[in-house]
């Protein structure tokens, strides 16, 4: 089980990213736009740099919904490989069966 503080930090980051996503996207669009003056682009880059680092989506890390484990994460099921194996063997995940050929 992951530390509660690490999971809480990740939840906090997700909220920050969600709250600032639109503003960040607009600033990035301005900074990359060639139709805007160089001064305007520079202001947009500075504004992006002044924003909190935790508002960037690249700071997010996928975690298991059940345990909070950051490694061995399976995107399709949003759980770690360990939880997946346990749940699959118990038949808790619909449509997942042990392979045999």
From Swiss-Prot:
Transmembrane segments: none annotated. One of its GO terms (cellular component) is small ribosomal subunit. One of its GO terms (molecular function) is rRNA binding. The keyword Ribosomal protein applies. GO terms for biological process: translation. PROSITE patterns: RIBOSOMAL_S14. The keyword Translocase does not apply. Part of the 30S ribosomal subunit. Contacts proteins S3 and S10. This is Small ribosomal subunit protein uS14. It comes from Chlamydia trachomatis serovar D (strain ATCC VR-885 / DSM 19411 / UW-3/Cx).
């Amino acid at each position: 089980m992951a530390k509660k503080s690490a999971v809480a930090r990740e939840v906090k980051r997700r909220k920050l990213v969600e709250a600032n996503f639109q503003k960040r996207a607009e600033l990035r669009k301005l900074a990359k736009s060639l139709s805007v003056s160089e001064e305007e682009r520079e202001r947009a880059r500075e504004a992006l740099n002044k924003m909190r680092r935790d508002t960037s989506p690249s700071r997010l890390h996928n975690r298991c919904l059940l345990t909070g484990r950051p490694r061995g994460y399976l995107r399709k099921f949003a759980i770690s490989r360990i939880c997946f194996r346990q749940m699959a063997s118990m038949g808790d995940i619909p449509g997942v069966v042990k392979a045999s050929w």
